[in-house]
């Protein structure tokens, strides 16, 4: 399991908090907290997906748009880190 990346984690937390603020919600967003439990709706998840793509300048592959990857900041961070790593030749 790869170690967490503080910069990536903080940027994702900032995105989540921004969406919560737009909805006039405040929550303690921890890396392990389930995003639905802190108040994100399915539409918020779409906005979060778009925000992640814009923030990290990549398109999330269809195969990575799964409930498992959007469960928490931690799972999102793992997916982002995987996408940001340069492709290795087989």
UniProtKB/Swiss-Prot annotation:
Cellular component aspect of the GO annotation: cytosol; membrane
Post-translational events: 4'-phosphopantetheine is transferred from CoA to a specific serine of the apo-form of this carrier protein.
Keyword annotations: Phosphopantetheine, Phosphoprotein
Family matches, as Gene3D superfamilies: ACP-like (1.10.1200.10)
PROSITE patterns with a match to the protein in the record: CARRIER
InterPro entries on file: ACP-like_sf, PP-bd_ACP
GO molecular function term, any single one: acyl binding
Domain Carrier stretches: 6-84
Gene Ontology terms describing biological process: lipid A biosynthetic process
Modified positions (O-(pantetheine 4'-phosphoryl)serine) in chain numbering: 42
Superkingdom assignment: Bacteria
Function: Aminoacyl carrier protein. Can be charged with L-glycine via the formation of a thioester bond between the amino acid and the 4'-phosphopantetheinyl prosthetic group, catalyzed by the bll0957 ligase.
The protein's name in its UniProt record: Aminoacyl carrier protein 1
Taxonomic source organism: Bradyrhizobium diazoefficiens (strain JCM 10833 / BCRC 13528 / IAM 13628 / NBRC 14792 / USDA 110)
């Amino acid at each position: 399991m790869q170690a967490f990346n503080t910069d990536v984690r903080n940027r994702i937390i900032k995105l989540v908090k921004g969406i919560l603020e737009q909805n006039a919600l405040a929550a303690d967003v921890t890396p392990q907290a389930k995003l639905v439990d802190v108040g994100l709706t399915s539409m918020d998840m779409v906005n979060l997906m778009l925000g992640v793509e814009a923030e990290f300048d990549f398109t999330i592959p269809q195969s990575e748009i799964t409930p498992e990857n959007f469960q928490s900041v931690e799972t999102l961070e793992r997916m982002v880190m995987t996408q940001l790593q340069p492709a290795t030749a087989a």
